[in-house]
Amino acid sequence: MQDVIKKIEDYSSRNGIMLPNPVTEYVAGIAEEEKLKDPELHDLVRLFSRICERNRGLEGEELLKAVEDEYLRILKVRELVKRKRAKFPPRLIEEIAEAIKRHGLSDDELDELVRGVRRAYERAMVEAGEAVGTVAAQSVGEPGTQMTMRTFHYAGVAELNVTLGLPRLIEIVDARKKISTPTMSIYFEGDRKYDEEFVRKKANKICKSTLNDVLKNFSIQYADMSVEAELDEEKIREKHLEYDDIIAKVEKTFKKVEIDNNILRFEPPKPTIRELRLLADKVRKLQISGVKNIGKVVIRKEDDEWVIHTEGSNLGDRFKEEGVDKVRTTTNDIHEIETVLGIEAARNAIIHEAKRTMEEQGLTVDIRHIMLVADMMTADGSVKSIGRHGISGEKASVLARASFEETGKHLLRASIRGEVDHLTGIIENIIIGQPIPLGTGSVSVIMKK
């Protein structure tokens, strides 16, 4: 541990990073600089990161002393847990170590605490042969009967509509490619999150703006078959747009256009009334700024920092933007998270979105049920729906597939291919009347002669 602390101290002093702000910067720096390939050393660096987060208010020598003391307490608990032949997750060991400091536990009291935690931990574990899938399905499905069918305003952002309740839960478990109301929450890092002017400029750059939004006057001249538009300099300033950028966009889109300061005069390709009206619509709807797939943008102040909420989502594009906090910025589009950040991030998004959807309706579901659903949806390395086009339609058992939906199709295809069902699952054994490999049926009795 002293070696790791020394490396972190050296790295932070060379790069001017004050402990512990932020921990991720110098931990990532060490991992890159030292090319750490030893898994134990990686675990040690992650542990150090968590310890630093818990001692965020300290700096320099005080921080290093606190880190060393906590690490020694964790080692003490680890040794005791090992002697008891218990298997605790790292977080639980760290919580026991924190209890030693908080309550000043003696060795005997620590021994008693570990014994009690072991009993509670083993009691909380799932029994072998338990039908966890059935319990999870019931635990998530039953509260769904109490959920609303309506689309509400997003909590705290009245200007944005976001799908909530049962429709949102269905979107999540169906793994819809196109969700009804995609939205992003964009956070900023450093001092920029407190800079309203900076955030508003970013918001105006993201927000979809059309030429119609910056016009003072607009008219169709039937006499000389032209469309005339006058730009409003005040509106252009309010939206933090550049006059030259607007003109460049207009000249690129329309071939027949005359520009006289703020007056724009357009001519249709053919001198007909129909073409003139089509041209007028095209002029008004010309997009002069914004990001693909993003419409309305709302800026809100949350806990002293400025946050952008959007209608529509383009996470990959926003991550390329300077000043955006890539750790906290997120979207409710699970497939986009999978594309940009990977399958583990998509799994976490499924858990977070499902849990939040339930909690917004005042419903509480044990997160382990939701985690099991998310694990099944992402087990193959891509996000799959729970239905005939996903998990249920891709089961190894012919009878299990046929029992869900499209029975005839599955039986016909299996017959053509000559598939064999080895009857290893639950549903197929229920269908043919055999004991199921679950609970008491998961063990066999051997009679000695």
Swiss-Prot record:
Molecular functions per Gene Ontology: DNA binding; DNA-directed RNA polymerase activity
Region annotation (Unknown) ranges: 1-68
GO process annotations (BP): DNA-templated transcription
Compartment annotation: Cytoplasm
EC number: 2.7.7.6
Reactions this protein catalyses: RNA(n) + a ribonucleoside 5'-triphosphate = RNA(n+1) + diphosphate
CDD domains, per database record: RNAP_A (cd06528)
Entry annotated with the keyword Cell division: no
Keywords assigned by UniProt, alphabetized: Cytoplasm, DNA-binding, DNA-directed RNA polymerase, Nucleotidyltransferase, Transcription, Transferase
Protein name: DNA-directed RNA polymerase subunit Rpo1C
Species of the source: Methanothermobacter thermautotrophicus (strain Winter) (Methanobacterium thermoautotrophicum)
UniProt gene name: rpo1C
